Swiss-Prot record:
Its EC number is 2.4.2.10. It comes from Teredinibacter turnerae (strain ATCC 39867 / T7901). It catalyses: orotidine 5'-phosphate + diphosphate = orotate + 5-phospho-alpha-D-ribose 1-diphosphate. GO terms for cellular component: cytoplasm. Orotate binds at residues 34-35, 128, 156. CDD domains: PRTases_typeI. Signal peptide: none annotated. HAMAP family: PyrE. This is Orotate phosphoribosyltransferase. Keywords: Glycosyltransferase, Magnesium, Pyrimidine biosynthesis, Transferase. Pathway: Pyrimidine metabolism; UMP biosynthesis via de novo pathway; UMP from orotate: step 1/2.
Length: 213
């Protein structure tokens, strides 16, 4: 586990974005952990997120020409990632995002920021069903831009109704690689290193039941 991944977990726990206990998910499953990126709402959090997303993207090796953030949670992530790439990686890339409702005045339309062109990295917090990402892929196709990678905060590595996770299904159906800052393996490694064997074992049992790998 890289230092930025451990720091991401530490920040998420300190901000209560990552919690351990018993949480009933929308699926009805009772999970031993819960991740809510909406809790990362401080200026220091968004700066940290930008650095982590930028590092994950750079480490992935996928060449990109611009950053795109799907409305709404992806909007600050796109800006923060673009800032971190410029400040820490000497890569000054344009960014854009979409609105959920089109404007009929001012600049109009659903797209804001730089024109969609070249190889585009899409940044979002998590992928649940993949619906929002598919909408973005359609926008890129219309603009004749190429999706280079999708970067998310956490990959739960959890299957849906079938044997695949939403991320696996998305990668298989679109061919677009998904990069995550952390996944379930990193959380378990962090807990074991911290000496919290009990929580790590609960997550391992949950993964045995619902894991996608």
């Amino acid at each position: 586990m890289h230092a930025y991944q451990q720091q991401f977990i530490e920040m998420a726990i300190a901000s209560q974005a990552l919690k351990f206990g018993e949480f009933t998910l929308k699926s009805g499953r009772v999970s031993p952990y819960f991740f809510n990126a909406g809790m990362l709402h401080m200026g220091s959090n968004i700066a940290h997120l930008g650095r982590a997303y930028a590092q994950a993207l750079v480490d992935s090796g996928h060449p990109v020409d611009m950053i795109f953030g799907p409305a709404y949670k992806g909007i600050p992530l796109a800006a923060a990632t673009a800032i971190a790439l410029a400040d820490h990686h000497n890569r000054d890339l344009p960014y854009a995002y979409n609105r959920k409702e089109a404007k009929d005045h001012g600049e109009g339309g659903t797209l804001v920021g730089a024109p969609l062109t070249g190889k585009v990295a899409i940044v979002d917090d998590v992928i649940t069903a993949g619906t929002a990402i598919r909408e973005v892929l359609a926008l890129l196709e219309q603009a004749k831009a190429e999706p280079a990678a999708i970067v998310i905060g956490l990959n739960r590595k959890e299957r849906g109704q079938g044997s695949l996770s939403a991320i696996d299904e998305l990668q298989q159906s679109t061919g677009v690689p998904v990069v995550s800052i952390i996944d379930l393996d990193h959380i378990m490694m962090y807990l074991e290193k911290a000496g919290d064997q009990q929580t790590s074992e609960k997550i391992a049992l949950y993964r045995e039941q619902y894991g996608s790998d």
